[in-house]
Regions:
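Hydrophobic alpha-helical segments within soluble ligand-binding/sensing domains
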Residues: 88, 144-167, 179-181, 209-210, ...
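Extracellular/periplasmic bilobed ligand-binding domains
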Residues: 120, 181-276
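Segments of small-molecule ligand-sensing domains
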Residues: 295-312, 316-378, 385
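Beta-alpha junction/loop-to-helix N-cap segments that form part of ligand/metal-binding clefts
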Residues: 47, 51-52, 69-135, 144, ...
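N-terminal secretory signal peptides and thylakoid transit peptides that target proteins
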Residues: 1-18
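Extracytoplasmic "Venus flytrap"
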Residues: 36-55, 79-85, 108, 172-179, ...
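Extracellular/periplasmic periplasmic-binding protein-like sensory domains
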Residues: 239-316, 383-389
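An alpha-beta-alpha
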Residues: 143-204, 223
Length: 392
């Protein structure tokens, strides 16, 4: 749905024939619908959290400019998770009970997502997780990044079509990787006639990858898949310093990481729902608005635009999808919103985007890109939309 269609649908809501477009004073006077942003605004993930905050405001400003939601303006209420599960739970409860937010978004870590869900169960509110995930399904959850099923199979299919048949994997030793990611990787590699030579499980906090890289070099795989969640920058830098020959591939890929690796990412192939290089009017408008919004900050640049993180686009997408579903349902109540989500299709920066039948995950194109020397990603292929698979 484009902005014109969204504006037209916004004419019909709780105010009947009176709308924000006709009577803007009514919208200004109406009590706002609050959106809760629960993000890491301090600590190592501050930039991710701040990007989510800015992108949430972009979505809210756009919706308010089109007349608001159900005849009421949207307003953002913000809390810092401090990257702590206990703090996230406390702040989620504050947003839900004190601020009476209609939904929660902005979380980066899976532990933050789980804490937000725990709090949301009491208040019966929607949690929108703006990150890729293992395929987590819950009646109160919408994930706006790609699930494992939407990442692994398309990337392995594309790689093995190009001749890569032997794979070594280096992954963070977390439960979702053991239960979902690596089994999906094994299945996809086997399905296409390849071999998964070994999986190297690394605990969070690992900073020296030398021994693992030496063992991989001795095995001589054609592909090395990495899912290092806590410090991919150090891993990629060491991978290049060892002059590794296998093609490096990953499901943790975006322009900001390429910049942080100071050229070491060049040539790596990644999979994501969003890259800045998507050439569409919607994406260019989004990047231009974001760049203007952060003009007074030290946000890194890539060409004419401030660097966008995929988490930010996922946050923007989640609020847009929530607002359209609530508008269609005539309510912000979670069950009504979840039911309406499955019928939605919006043009977003990533492209045309819908939601799975259960309302748990987005359905959009899976983008395969290759990091370039200028830190951009060249789009190699777009696959899908691929249906997600629930993993609990």
């Amino acid at each position: 749905m484009n902005r014109r269609d969204f504006s037209r649908s916004a004419l019909w809501g709780a105010l009947g024939v009176f709308s924000a477009a006709v009577c803007p004073n009514l919208v200004r006077a109406a009590a706002p619908i609050k959106i809760g942003l629960l993000a890491p605004l301090s600590g190592p993930l501050t930039r991710v959290g701040e990007t989510n905050r800015h992108c949430a405001m972009l979505a809210i400003e756009e919706i308010n400019a089109a007349g608001g939601l159900l005849g009421r303006p949207l307003e953002l209420a913000v809390e810092d998770t401090q990257m702590s599960t206990a703090v996230t739970l406390e702040k989620a409860r504050q947003l839900l009970m004190r601020d009476e937010v209609a939904m929660l978004t902005g979380m980066v870590l899976p532990s933050e997502r789980e804490a937000a869900l725990q709090a949301a169960k009491t208040a019966a509110r929607l949690v929108v997780y703006p990150n890729f995930d293992e395929g987590r399904c819950d009646p109160l959850l919408l994930s706006t990044g790609l699930s494992v099923a939407q990442r692994v199979e398309p990337l392995i299919t594309w790689l093995m079509r190009g001749g890569g048949k032997s794979v070594s994997a280096v992954v963070s030793d977390v439960g979702s990787n053991r239960k979902v990611l690596v089994p999906a990787l094994e299945t996809a590699v086997s399905r296409h006639g390849g071999r998964l030579l070994n999986v190297y499980w690394l605990p969070f906090g690992t900073r020296d990858y030398g021994a693992v890289l030496q063992r991989i070099a001795a095995q001589q795989p054609q592909l090395v898949w990495h899912s290092i969640g806590d410090d991919p920058v150090t891993f990629v830098k060491q991978y290049r310093s060892f002059a590794m020959r296998p093609q490096l591939v990953t499901d943790i890929a975006h322009e900001s990481l390429s910049i942080a690796t100071a050229g070491a990412s060049t040539g790596a192939i990644g999979v994501s729902s969003y890259f800045m290089s998507i050439d569409s009017a919607e994406n260019h408008r989004f990047l231009a608005r974001y760049t203007a919004r952060v003009a007074d900050t030290r946000a890194p640049r890539l060409g004419p635009y401030a660097v966008m993180l995929p988490h930010g686009e996922c946050t923007y997408a989640g609020i847009r999808l929530f607002a359209q579903a609530a508008q269609d349902a005539g309510s912000v109540e979670v069950m009504h919103v979840k039911t309406a989500l499955s019928g939605i299709s919006l043009n977003l920066p990533r492209g045309k985007t819908g939601v799975s039948r259960a309302g748990d995950h987005v359905t959009c194109m899976t983008r395969i890109g290759q990091a370039q020397a200028d830190n951009s990603f060249a789009l190699l292929d777009s696959v899908g939309p691929i249906l997600p698979t629930c993993q609990g």
